[in-house]
Amino acid sequence: MDKMELKALGKINLGLDVLGRRENGYHDVRMVMQTVYLYDQIRMEKTKKPGIELLTNLFYLPVNENNLAYQAADLLMKEFHVKEGVKITLDKHIPVAAGMAGGSSNAAAVLFGINRMFSLGLSQKELMERGVTLGADVPYCVMRGTVLAEGIGEILTPLPACPKCHVLIAKPPISVSTKLVYEKL
């Protein structure tokens, strides 16, 4: 497959308990997460030139190794010695720094895309295992749905689906880094 389009779905936390801080700086949590149909559009195209080219519609987003989508592509392409390259175009719609896993969902979508585009044969579980090395929400974004997350967010238990409903998401004109919030706890 030389081209594909993917939807990187956002998520909301229906409940979040922070249980304690680990020595490595991560926090033990118990939370219920729900996928929402607000998504970033990701287009991927195989290229003959080795490497990763990342483009985005938001000028202030990094398009290098500081971007989780780039890191996800780099992780699998290095591990599996992919000789070709990939061009990733990211059209952001999930609010940035809103706690909706925008970066993590982009990484999950790119993991799925690289796996499929280059026929790597990884299972969902294997993608989730690699995803946790990129961020605690990435395994959830690979799994999606209504899920109880424990540990640092990587121990996932599917729950019965929430009833279909409309959700109003209001994002004020300020941004809050999830990483910084957890560091302050």
Short names for language-model regions:
Residues 80-86, 154-158:
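Structural signature of cysteine-dependent C-C bond-forming condensing enzymes
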Residues 30, 86-99:
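Short pre-catalytic strand/loop immediately N-terminal to key active-site residues, enriched for Gly-Thr
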Residues 69, 98-126:
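DPxDG-like acidic metal-binding loop motif
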Residues 2-83:
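N-terminal beta-alpha supersecondary unit
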Residues 2-7, 11, 15-31, 120-185:
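ATP-dependent small-molecule kinase catalytic core of the GHMP/sugar-kinase superfamily
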Residues 15, 45, 55-57, 87-91, ...:
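Solvent-exposed beta-strand sheet faces enriched in polar/charged residues
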